[in-house]
Amino acid sequence: MPENSSIPNCCEASGLAARPSWSGSAGARPPVTARAPWVAPMLSTVVVVTTAVDFVGNLLVILSVLRNRKLRNAGNLFVVSLALADLVIALYPYPLILVAIIRDGWVLGEAHCKASAFVMGLSVIGSVFNITAIAINRYCCICHSTTYHRVCSHWYTPIYISLVWLLTLVALVPNFFVGSLEYDPRIYSCTFIQTASTQYTAAVVAIHFLLPMAVVSFCYLRIWVLVLQARRKAKATRKLRLRPSDLRSFLTMFAVFVVFAICWAPLNCIGLAVAINPEAMALQVPEGLFVTSYFLAYFNSCLNAIVYGLLNQNFRREYKRILLAIWNTRRCIQHASKHCLTEERQGPTPPAARATVPVKEGAL
């Protein structure tokens, strides 16, 4: 089948999915397998549910922090930054993936393909770096509380968040030189192609996943040690005194980290295995396992808001307030619309009906 010359290594002229150009590993092309008819509807359902929960959930997180004074602190500014990283993926790449599933291939052109892959990478790496920054922030807050308020105030936190996103952009630049952002028909997505450069894939897994996870693990391990020390002593010293709000925030963000690691570990393990031995592993990885690991990673973007609601009472209460306010506004609009429609159907009240009926003498 001839490829569309205007969209090299992206999609075919007929609109059906074409295999990406596995540059650097010509012999490591995964086998083409026929798919069961239920696969596309199932993946469509996953994308639709993930997009809806991602959009609504992360919007609730952002509004909750902006509305609630108890949540409006320096630490939760990182939470807003993480929510934005998850939200952006629901606004652009996910709808394009849904179109590719429905059309059974990429039909939106090379520009959208590259842009979608870039935004996808921006969201993923931004999430990793924000989770790392949150862990460092919690570590400084709990383990070094005396210096925390000086180095993590409302004035410095926006600078740290800007640095996180600057590092995210810098981390994405090499993709344009390696040529690793292409369409992969197995997952109906324009994304990072693991076999484009085995050395670069190994570096990506190490720098964008293993190293941040090691830093986060160290920070949370130190916090756990401090928490256990504080609980073992009947009267904790000033150094070990923990506020309930700090402990609750730590547990919430630790759960976010665990969920992220579980969702992204399978895909990164596959990437590392392919980078170590591309000729053998690229052929041995089952397509079902690869697709499942990718969509599990996608699904992570909608889980953080759920974790906040389950583990943090302030977020849960603010969710209810926002949803209740939206519901009441909707009911008021519906009531006003029904009232207007009733008046239009009945027509204007005649003057005689509006006139005051005179009271007869002796009626009282």
Curated annotation (Swiss-Prot):
A Pfam family per the record: 7tm_1
Disulfides per UniProt: C113-C190
Extracellular side, ranges: 1-42, 98-115, 177-200, 275-287
Glycosites: N4
Alphabetical keyword list: Cell membrane, Disulfide bond, G-protein coupled receptor, Glycoprotein, Membrane, Receptor, Transducer, Transmembrane, Transmembrane helix
GO biological process: circadian rhythm
Membrane topology term: Multi-pass membrane protein
Superkingdom of this protein's organism: Eukaryota
Membrane-crossing segments per the record: 43-63, 77-97, 116-136, 156-176, 201-221, 254-274, 288-308
Name this protein carries in UniProt: Melatonin receptor type 1B
Organism, as annotated: Mus musculus (Mouse)
Gene coding for it: Mtnr1b
